[in-house]
Amino acid sequence: MSAAAKNQNIPTIFNNHFAEFINDICTIFPDNVRILSAKNALSTIRRANPKMIIKIWINYVATPYENQIDRGDISFFLEKDYSSDFVDYNQSDNIMEYINMLRDPIRNMGQENQAKAMKYIQNLSKIAELL
């Protein structure tokens, strides 16, 4: 498989892993309507523009917070105010809403599940680096 073909598969791999992450959160909090809303919104975005989520992840998560991700610092992500990170992004309010839809339940998880959530963040960042 050529390098170009491998790169074309990266967004699919990333999106599948991201969907798995959200599904795991849904499993822990099956009655949380906000998580289901985030899941549906991300699914819609993925169908409309499969590369959008990974590009946002690279620019706004993986690159600026590489050190915190590498350290596995879940508390950083749970407490951080992201509003200034998306000032230049035209849908910043929507992104902040989705972040909070996912972050709030993670904040309410036990340590073991928070560690799993952090592992997802680390894995997603590693996958994104391959693009």
Walk through the language-model features, giving the residues of each:
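Terminal low-complexity "docking" segments
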Residues: 2-115, 129-130
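Short, hydrophobic/amphipathic alpha-helical patches that form generic packing surfaces
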Residues: 119-127
